[in-house]
């Protein structure tokens, strides 16, 4: 059908799944379960929205500074969802609080540093 956007399969790495669990646990412990559930639902909506037009995401500045433009990011403030488009798949690698030292997080998780 003309005008129908391409659909991508969205996959979460084990690390991204663990990120979601850690975010939920942290908010549950220091705030409340209802807010943790709200944030988790919102993050999952952001993740699922990448099934259409994932190219809309920006390049993480920490990686662009290293000349790396194969990863993109989208946001549910203050959280950053870092992903890569491979064929018809969107692979989520990192879901992290953007207030953290993202240079270290990205180096460790994406570059194996």
Model-derived features with residue positions:
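Alpha-helical transmembrane segments and membrane-interface helix-loop junctions
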Residues: 12-14, 44-45, 53-57
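Residue-level recognition of specific faces of alpha-helices
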Residues: 19, 26, 42, 46-49, ...
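Gly/Ser/Thr-rich helix-start
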Residues: 37, 58, 99
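Enriched for short, Lys/Arg-rich terminal
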Residues: 76-80, 84-113
């Amino acid at each position: 059908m003309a005008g129908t956007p391409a659909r991508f399969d969205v996959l979460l790495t084990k690390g991204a799944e663990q990120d979601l669990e850690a975010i939920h646990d942290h908010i549950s412990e220091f705030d409340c379960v209802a807010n943790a559930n709200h944030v988790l639902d919102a993050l999952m909506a952001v993740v699922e929205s990448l099934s259409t037009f994932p190219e809309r995401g920006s390049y993480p500045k920490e990686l662009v500074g290293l000349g790396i433009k194969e990863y993109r990011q989208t946001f549910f403030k203050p959280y950053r969802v870092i992903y890569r488009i491979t064929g018809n798949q969107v692979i989520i690698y990192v879901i992290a609080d953007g207030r953290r030292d993202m240079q270290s997080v990205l180096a460790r998780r994406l570059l194996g540093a």
